[in-house]
Amino acid sequence: MYGQKNELLGKRGTKIMKFGALYSYWGHEWKCDYIETAKKMKKCGCEVLEIGASHLLEMRDEQLRGLKATCDELGMEITSNIGPSKEYDLASEDPAVRANGVKFLADIMKAMKKIGSKSLVGAMYSYWPCTDFKFDEKAGAWDRSIEAMKEVAKVAEDLDVECCLEVLNRFETYILTDCDEAIEYCKRVGSKNVNILLDTFHMNIEEDNLPDVIRKAGELLGHFHVGEGNRKLPGMSKGAMPWAEIGEALREINYNKCVVAEPFLLVGGRVGADIKVWRDLSNGADEEQMDKYLAESIKFLKEKFVE
């Protein structure tokens, strides 16, 4: 029965990973009907719905209650994904912009409490996509971002929210582009509520060895995004990504949090433009086939990641 138990347990009765996907999977725009999307994801085997965090500030309390009630009934966890715009840049040279960013993230975390979401994930340390930076400004940007993130961390600690900082690639940010940088950044922030989000798509561009990077992150790994090197669903590009070895590394560090697919298969709309999807990666799939792709990928991930 839905809602009675939403944690997968391993053979020894210990909590293990839960699997899900980003809300935008079926769409061309950064919006959706969250209740219907949650139901569709549940039918595909998902245990996690990753929403757009900024949408929470646009939703009425009754809408937030409805989303929470639906996900509680389905036994689904909600994680909240953020890629702030430039007006909320924590690394900005303008103190007013940094203060605006801290307030923005604090307001989001307060809204997250209303739906029971405890994970805020993404490139909240700056803005996304970040395209107008200069290398010789990086040290100062780091200092500003870290000081602002310390303020965000205080709110996260008060609200029991985990902030997971996404390590991106060189084309989307200059703040955190590999795991070593993320570890150093988190150490400088110095909060148990600020950890790392690794994403196999970005790792495949920037890291030398994906399983070893997971081991390096260790207990700092708070969230994990998965996708093939071309942003297809895990398992769609046969042999391109070392999924079994990635799963082994996750088990070695006793990772027991969320694994969220972040696939982008469709051309068109704001999503296609922002993610740079210039050709159809779905093989002309209709909605039913898209459902099947997701269900097969979730099954694939569980087989590779869970003993």
PLM regions and their residue ranges:
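Low-complexity, intrinsically disordered or signal/transmembrane-proximal segments
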Residues: 2-4
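Active-site acidic/histidine proton-transfer and metal-coordination neighborhood
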Residues: 7-9, 15, 33, 72-74, ...
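Histidine-acidic metal/acid-base catalytic patches
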Residues: 8-25, 32-45, 116-118, 176-198, ...
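Active-site-proximal loop/turn and secondary-structure-junction residues that shape catalytic pockets
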Residues: 25-27, 53-55, 84-86, 126-128, ...
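Glycine-rich, proline-tolerant flexible connector loops at the mouths of alpha/beta enzymes
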Residues: 50-71, 129-130
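Catalytic-core regions built around general acid/base machinery
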Residues: 63-73, 151-152, 216, 245-249
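Short acidic/His/Gly/Ser-rich catalytic and metal-binding motifs that mark active-site loops
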Residues: 87-89, 128-132, 268-273
